[in-house]
Amino acid sequence: MTVATYHHGNLANAVVEAGLRRVRQRGLDAISGRELAGSVGVTPAAIYRHFADKASLRAAISQAAREQLARAISLPRPRATNKQGAAERFRQIGLAYVEFALNEPLLYAAAFEICEPPRPDNPSAWEVLTEALDDLVRSGAMPASRRPGAEMVAWCAVHGVSNLITAPMAGVPVKQRAAVIQQVLDGVKRSLQITP
């Protein structure tokens, strides 16, 4: 039995949403155009009127996963203008990134599929991080001299610990895992000379 879950003109979005549901269950490698077509009530040929091939379909689903990551690290974290607020927002963004990886491991893995996205991410996790770093400098919580390249320092540290705790360290007790996450976040803070 198939059920149409899209409205005329919105098939591409319906397919990507169905793809995200499948990714959460089985991962990006389990994506099948035929299966997604059935889940939205169309033929496989209808899907490929919107996506050039399976690689394009996977790229769109990967991008949607990255955009979900961006939303997860954005909310509810309003931009801050004082040192303490900017530093706390930066820390919360790092924690939210790790929590996304822990809570949505297959979606997290799909987000970093090597592919050519159909358009720029919107929202973009990189832009969320960039804004947070700019706010740290504006508020005086981080020296301007530490700003160049700070995105890579922060991203690599948080992405690295996220990969470790979702794979090799998956069986580590929660308390020990939390301590490792905190050590990494503290290391980023020290490296970028963030105060307070």
Q: Over which residues does each language-model region extend?
A:
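Hydrophobic alpha-helical connector segments
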Residues: 74-107, 117, 126, 154
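Amphipathic alpha-helical linker/stalk segments
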Residues: 3, 63-91, 120, 130-134
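Alpha-helical DNA-contacting segments of helix-turn-helix folds
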Residues: 23, 58-65, 111, 115, ...
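Short, structured helix-loop boundary elements
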Residues: 12, 33, 59, 83, ...
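N-terminal intrinsically disordered/low-complexity leader segments
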Residues: 1-10, 21, 80-83, 195-196
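Hydrophobic/aromatic-rich alpha-helical bundle segments in the mid-to-C-terminal region
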Residues: 108, 113, 119-126, 137-186, ...
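Generic hydrophobic, amphipathic alpha-helix propensity
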Residues: 11-19, 36, 61-69, 73, ...
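Helix-turn-helix
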Residues: 14, 18, 22-56, 60
